[in-house]
Amino acid sequence: MKRRLRAYKKTVSIVNEKAIELYKGLGIEKKGFLLEGTDKESGQYTFMGVEPNEIIQSDKDSLVITRKDGSREVREGNPLIRLKEYFDEFEIVKDPGELDFIGGLVGSLGYDYIRYTEVLPDDNPDEIGIETIQLMLADKFIAINHTAETFTAVVLGEDSEEGRIKALKEAEELIKTAREGVDKFKDDKPDMSLDGVILKKSDTLEQYSKKVNKIKNYIKEGHIFQTVLSQRWTIKTGQSGFNLYEKLRELNPSPYMYYFNFGDFEIIGSSPEMIVKQSDNKVYTCPIAGTRKRGATKEQDIALEEELLADEKERAEHVMLVDLARNDMGR
């Protein structure tokens, strides 16, 4: 039986509140998420919420749903199939002029997600013990419109008069809670001191160099087009993931920044790139390839941009990424 829900909203004007302050007001110690956009010109939103009613995680060959009251439901079978079944249980009634996002699942899908659809070797050791699917049900959250300078409390509730009254009351309480915390954290600056100690690197320079040469040979022989070669560093620090996120957004502000607190672990990141987006019946991809340093002046920026566009290698790599993305989308 489908859960028929409607998005109920209350919108207020921003009065000198910053997104990071509003999130702190909701409670950084709670499980929650912050999806932060900073580009006002493109009309980006910031979304945030805490204390999700349900957390959805894979556990080897099953999907586990942990509810706010502590109860757990285990659904055996391919986690991707079970996730699709879970998603299909919801029906959200959309009104005209809705926000692009009015509720649903937010979180992280690891690289091993592909193993749910492809048969591939699986001989990489699991060094961190975090399962592939890590999602939260965002059914009560705040959406900040950076262009209109407003923020909206969104609550998914039953599609009934009783549901409407209850949801709007929760929306008002959400706004009140966020705003009450703002004064406490007003103009609070992140601690930029460094206390990290590197405990482990996944590769030495020699090991990493050998892998690079191996990849080059695979490309020359036509076995692969591209490999994203990464290295994991394990660092000991006394700071929380949110402290590190605050530093990251100061040092590397980007159009797409994210913070997830799952209780046992936190995920942070910052990216200039929107990989894939679905809007109604259209799918968009915007891969980025090639980089240049920033110039000291606007004229230097333009010159570096023209240099990048004229670089045959960079253009070829970008075309390859677009083709790969298009092929994947076509599947």
Language model: regions and residue ranges:
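Extended alpha-helical targeting/anchoring segments
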Residues: M1-R331
